[in-house]
Amino acid sequence: MKPASTRLLAINAVSKVFHDGACETQVLHEVNLTVHRGEQLAIVGSSGSGKSTLLHIMGTLESPTSGTVLLEGENLHQLSSKRQAQIRNQDLGFIYQFHHLLPEFSALENVAMPAFIQGKNKAQTLAEAKALLERVGLGHRLTHLPSQLSGGERQRVAIARALINKPKLVLADEPTGNLDAVSGEAVYGLIRELAEQLGTAFVVVTHDANLAARMDRQVNMKDGILSQSETHR
């Protein structure tokens, strides 16, 4: 068991119920999970198992019906909307199945955008964005628009964007789901490499057990219930 000092995110008895008129559907059942600093964690489950909902709650994009989510001891869902937005921009990074890049901006500008929103120095931010794109193998594609990039290249830009503010935790929802096998493997390799080099924790939601097995640890979700974790290394 890892010491408490390495704990980054603690999810305690989190449940989620969706209401539709008189009907209610419980998608999470008292989930408990700890994410450690620099850890690479996979959440595996079939579609509709609740794994994406859990990821959204971890990122303050949705609120739990009950339970708590603590980031370095701070209860995320007791904070103001403004403070939650600050945490999403400063401490969390997000990667989705679809890259959500801004089509009118270059790869370099897309990566820099979260730092611009935070009001960071433009020249320094662009230099850091360039360095990140070089790190993900796209130093030669800085001025290209998303429409001029392949699917794998767009997702690499999205990964660089997620890291621009040096987050403590990156949340990735099916980041390879829209890619071919070769590109998907490259993206997972990049996630592992960056986690190890930068000390950033990654939580990756996926239905692909083979890819999840390459992470430090995986947990399995079925019908909103999280199973015991499996450590790989």
UniProtKB/Swiss-Prot annotation:
Keyword field: ATP-binding, Cell inner membrane, Cell membrane, Membrane, Nucleotide-binding, Translocase, Transport
Which InterPro entries does this UniProt record tie to the protein?
A: AAA+_ATPase, ABC_transporter-like_ATP-bd, ABC_transporter-like_CS, ABC_transpr_LolD-like, LolD_lipo_ATP-bd, MacB-like_ATP-bd, P-loop_NTPase
The record places domain ABC transporter at 9-233
* Alphabetized GO MF terms: ATP binding; ATP hydrolysis activity; transmembrane transporter activity
Q: Could you provide one GO biological process annotation from this protein's UniProt record? A: protein localization to outer membrane
Matching CDD domains, A to Z? ABC_MJ0796_LolCDE_FtsE
| A Gene Ontology term for the protein's cellular component | plasma membrane
SUPFAM superfamilies linked to this entry: P-loop containing nucleoside triphosphate hydrolases
Localisation:
Cell inner membrane
Q: How does it sit in the membrane?
A: Peripheral membrane protein
Top-level EC class:
translocase
Task: Report the EC number(s), separated by commas if there are several.
Answer: 7.6.2.-
Q: Which residues cross the membrane?
A: none
Q: Which Pfam families match?
A: ABC_tran
Under SMART domains, the record lists: AAA
Oligomeric state and interaction partners are given as: The complex is composed of two ATP-binding proteins (LolD) and two transmembrane proteins (LolC and LolE).
Family in the record: Belongs to the ABC transporter superfamily. Lipoprotein translocase (TC 3.A.1.125) family.
This one is known as: Lipoprotein-releasing system ATP-binding protein LolD
Please spell out the taxonomic lineage of the organism that makes this protein.
Bacteria, Pseudomonadati, Pseudomonadota, Gammaproteobacteria, Alteromonadales
Gene designation per UniProt: lolD
